Amino acid sequence: MKLCLLLLLLCLCHLGLTEEPSPGAPDVSDSVDEEEDTVHGCRGGQVFSREEHRVIGGAIERLGLQLLENLPIGPKQPNVILSPLSLAFALAQLTLGARNETEKLLLKSLHAHGVPCYHHILGSLVPHFSKTSLDVATRMYLRPGFDVKLSFVEDSLARYRSQPVPLVSVEEVNQWVENVTNGHIPNFLESIPHDVVLMLMNAVYFKGEWKTRFDPQVTSKGAFYLDSQNSVSVDMMKSVHYPLRLLDDPELEAQVASFPFKGNTSFLIVLPLPGKENVSSVLPKLNISDLYRRLPQEKTMQVNLPKVKLQYRQELQEALTSMGLGSLFSGPDLSGISDQPLRVTGVRHASTVELSEEGVEASATTVVTSMRSVSLFSVTSPFIFALVDDASLAPLFMGIVTNPAPDNDPMLNDGPLGNSTMSDQPTTDSDRERDINSKQSSKTESAECSSMASCSAPFGEREQPHSLNELEGGNGQKKTEDRSCSKPDDSVPA
C-alpha cells in the first residue's frame, strides 16, 4: 500500500489599511496576456490530448525538482515529502489574480510560459485523477467583509473547483483539514492571524495498492545505511519474484525502478550507486519523464524495500524565495483578487507517506528457470522517490528519504561502505547475478560470506563467485571459508 496525503495552505493578508491600490490597476477582464494564454483564452470543457497533459506533467515535474533542491535536509529533517501537483494548483490559482510582473513571475515559476491553455489543461487533470486513487480537494476561505473580485472567485471555481467559504474560526478550518485527509492531519492551525483575509487551501490524498503485494510474513529486520559510518534498523519488505521495471543509468550513476500501482500510477525510485553519487548531486540531473520513457519492460527480480511511515511539515516561504518568488511576500500585484493591496504571508505544507505490504494481488508466481537470471534491487540507502501518473507523467508526490526510521537510534557500520548505497547493492546485472547466486547457497558459510557488505576487505577487492559450482570448486569440494564474514541480514528464502 502507498498512502500519501498533503495539505498546502497559502495565506494572504492586507499590506496595510492606510495604503491605496495602485492607480490604473487593470481590471480582470482586460488583464489577460494572450501570449501567455491565461484562463480567458481557451474554451471551458475542452478535451485535451495525452500529449497536452504530458506537457503540463513536465512543467509540474520541473517545479517539484526545483523545490526539492531548495528544501533543507539534515539530521533534524532527514526526509522531504511534497506534492508538486498541489503546489502547482495553489500557485496557478494565485496566478489567476496576479497582474503585470507578478503574473509573469508566477507563470515562469510554474514553467507555464508558452504553454497554451495552461489553466484549462491543469484544471482538467482534476477529473482525470478521479479515475485513479488520487483525491484532490481545494477550498478558498474568505474573511467576512473582505472585498474580493467576483471574477477571481468564478475563475477559481471553474478551473480548480476551489469552493469559496467564509473564514469563521480556526476550529472550522482544522475540521475541514481533518476530514479531507481522513484524520491524518489534525489541528493543522494553532490560530489565524487577524490580518489574514484569504486562505487558499489544497489537499491531495492518495491511498493506493501495489499491483503486486509483498508478503507480510517475509518482512524482517534489515539495515538501512545512512552513510559510510552509520546505519539504522528497519522493517524490510522482501520478495524473491517481483515484477519490476529496472534501469541502470550510467549518466545518473543510479538505478531507477518503477513499481506499478493499481489505477494507472507508478512508484519510481532513484537509487544512487555505491561510492558514486548521493541524492543531492543526482537531483540537478534528474528528468523523471525521460527516465520513465526509457524504462525497459517489466521482469521478475528479487526486491528488498524498506517499510516507511513518515510525517513532514514545512513552511515553504524560504524555499520559494530561493526560487525567485520572494516578491510574493513583500509587494506583489494581486489586483485581480481585490483592489485592496495584498501580500502572501505564508505557505504551510504538511504531508505523510506510508509504504507497507498491501496490494491487489499476491506476488507473481512466474516460474524462473534459473536463479542466475534474476536481478536484485535492494533499497538500503538514501533514495529519491516519485509517485507518477502514468498518463500525464505528472509527479503527484516526490520526496527524498535519507532515513526511513528517524526515531530509531543509528548504529555504527561493521566495515567500510559506499557513501550512498549498501555495498551488497550491485551496480550491474552481472553483479546482481553474482549476488543472487551467493545468497541462494546455504550449503557453505563461504557462500554466505561472498556477497557481504560488512567484510573487512573493501568491496572492490572481495572475490565474487560466478556460480554455485564455483563456490564448491567445480568438483563438489568446498573452497576455503572466510570466517571474517557473517550471514547477510537481508537474505531472502526462495
Residue positions per predicted region:
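Intrinsically disordered, low-complexity segments
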Residues: 282, 455-458, 471-474
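Short Gly/aromatic-enriched secondary-structure transition segments
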Residues: 106-110, 214-221, 280-289
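Detector for small/aliphatic-rich hydrophobic stretches
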Residues: 2-166, 359-360, 407, 414-415, ...
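Extracytoplasmic/secreted cell-surface and envelope-processing proteins
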Residues: 102-104, 277-279, 312-314, 394-398, ...
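Non-catalytic, conformational "gating/processing" segments within enzyme and secreted inhibitor domains
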Residues: 24-28, 77-78, 93, 116-278, ...
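Extended hydrophobic
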Residues: 200, 250-270, 370-415
